[in-house]
Regions:
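Glycine-rich loop-to-alpha-helix module at the N-terminal edge of alpha/beta enzyme cores
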Residues: 55, 61, 66-136
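Hydrophobic face of amphipathic alpha-helices that form TPR/SEL1-like repeat modules
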Residues: 1-70, 90
């Protein structure tokens, strides 16, 4: 049906979880925080769907705990910037020509994952990376 307009879901804020002592969300978050602090993550660049690593890395520390390295990322050079721009420009037309419903469904799927099975992981990463508390 080419003339059909897809229904747009009404926007709603996610419920604010209480993170009360012994609550499931608090246990999940504490587990995820401990897991993320126990690993040093290697963060490559992604260019044209491929992982790109360099010998030039930069360490990442939580702002509230500068003695604890949590990751390092691979620093790009001018050639990486040009490769990334070229790839993005090639993808732009494909994205622009995609039906808006398909583009919207990608963002809705991401929102479902972030608010569902990956909620504790996103919260833990944000808390460690930006020194936020669970309510921020």
């Amino acid at each position: 049906m080419p003339n059909k307009i897809a229904p747009i879901p009404s926007p709603q804020n996610e419920p604010i979880l209480g993170y009360l002592p012994n609550s499931n969300e608090r246990k999940a978050l504490k587990t995820e925080l401990a897991r993320r602090k126990s690993v040093i993550y290697d963060i490559p660049m992604f260019i044209n769907g491929k992982e790109v690593r360099t010998n030039d890395t930069v360490d990442i520390f939580p702002p509230h705990e500068l003695s604890h390295k949590i990751a390092h990322y691979h620093k790009g050079k001018t050639e990486h910037i040009h490769q990334a721009i070229d790839t993005a420009l090639k993808a732009r037309d494909k994205w622009a020509n995609m039906h808006w419903e398909d583009r919207a469904s990608i963002f809705l799927k991401a929102a479902d994952l972030i608010s569902g099975p990956y909620r504790a992981a996103i919260n833990a990463a944000t808390m460690l990376g930006q020194s936020k508390n669970v309510y921020q």
